[in-house]
């Protein structure tokens, strides 16, 4: 859980967790449908490209971590995501969930969910329905 906490602290400062050596070189990054760039990408460069795309699309992005949950092989982060559309000025806010998989002190997988219940379910913490 400590690695995930440090990752989110770095992101809050506008710093890439890659610069801290916290990402596995082959990290898998999964964006949900409806995201700026949905789909799966692999590698640190692709992870950073996805973050850059988000920064290009939105101003004043904030991810406020509400809870970090140890789920044995994974770590779930429940957070409030707020941002303003760079072109439209439209404000967005939603309760997101993130599932991190950590091995040997590095993030090997990050999956973003627009619904916290979906993140919990993906980590085996809550049954569907």
Where are these regions (language model features)?
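A short hydrophobic beta-strand element
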Residues: 72-81
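Short, cysteine-centered beta-strand-loop-beta hairpins and adjacent loop/turn segments enriched
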Residues: 56-57, 83-93
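Short beta-strand edge/turn micro-motifs at domain boundaries
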Residues: 97-121
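A solvent-exposed, acidic/Ser-Thr-rich amphipathic alpha-helical stretch
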Residues: 17-73
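Hydrophobic/aromatic beta-strand elements that line small-molecule binding cavities or substrate pockets
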Residues: 63-69, 82-83, 95-101, 111
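A short, polar/proline- and glycine-enriched secondary-structure boundary/capping micro-motif
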Residues: 40-41, 87-90, 118-124
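Short acidic-aromatic low-complexity motifs
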Residues: 1-26, 126
